[in-house]
């Protein structure tokens, strides 16, 4: 009876929020484990069903209304701006080491973890760097953690670099775009 009631709650929640495809895969796995645990140790299965809900919630992908201005630069991530400063371009890019404006956004576990295009334009380059998984809020995380660098160029040939950095909790970066893809902010 509990699994059927839980399934009804899940269907209702899915109808409220769009969920990223990666979330469905992990949700299915966690639900199968939860269901199997019902026959072994039911109290643990209840906890695992609740964890399954968390998986769906973590991978939510809500619709966004972005400005119609093609020259606008929007935040590529939900989160808190934790630093605005001047910094050199990431050394892995071919853009030199001239200082540029850097805006650091920290995403905690309650933020939407689907990143967006900061500008309308074409992906000029994608650079993946394997690394460690320090707490993302530490300064050393931006240099030592796993990261994915996206270089985009708009119609005015201006470049924007967006760096995704993995952390202790969100330990992997999945990119679903390719070089030369045109994106809209």
Whereabouts are the PLM-identified features?
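Contiguous, well-folded functional domains in the mature portion of proteins
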Residues: 1-185
